[in-house]
Amino acid sequence: MSEILVVKLGGTTIAEQSQVLEDVAAVARRRPVVLVHGGGKRITEWLERLGVPSKFEGGLRVTDQQSLEVAAAVLRGVVNSELVAGLRDLGVDAVGLSGVDGGLLIAERIPHLGLVASVAGLRRDLLDAILVAGQVPVVAPLARDADGIVCNVNADDAAAGIAVGLGARQLVLMTDVDGVRDAEGRKLETLTVAEAEHLIEAGVIAGGMVPKIRAALSALGWEGAEAIIADGGADRALERALSDPSFGTRITAAREASVGAA
């Protein structure tokens, strides 16, 4: 099997993601792809309709039982189904599942965030079976902890955990910004582990970008591995993220100074 690519998308509407889905479909015809998706904005919208406030700590959603039920319904029932249908309309044999299905994701609870967990492991055989069959797994970020309780998982963390578990050397995190910026606001084309940690400590990287960067760093355990943060709304976003070094920000384990800012 060719080199596996793990791609994380946000949870915006299919209309907003039609271009990137076409990119995913094109790449999936050439190499195995695992698609992981979020749904934060749409979860917040549904919670607002129900009069439930959203609370975040360190860029991560604090999740109680009511919020979890909404998150699970939106992630698995709405967003996942839309993405699978969208890919199948493009001729891709996509299969939808969550980290709960088959015990795909092994989760470790983050107590201070409520019903939230990080990824501690992966049942690789499940994804391997789907990929070997020529299908594209579309994964919703839900998982059960050691007590069997279903938890919300940050989608970036889920994607990184899957990348590590599969030994994938490329992880693409699609977001709504064009990359990581330095203290002067310049977009960085490359970023090393040390540089990323420094920018976090200095408060330059803040809010929801922090867990995204942390997830990217956790995926760099393989030689030659890279995580790419790119604007999923840009034209040909995935194709450019994979082929154009100036598109987005590439994060590597290299210790040398970065190429610089754009």
Enumerate the language-model features and the residues they cover.
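C-terminal catalytic "cap/lid" subdomain
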Residues: 1-262
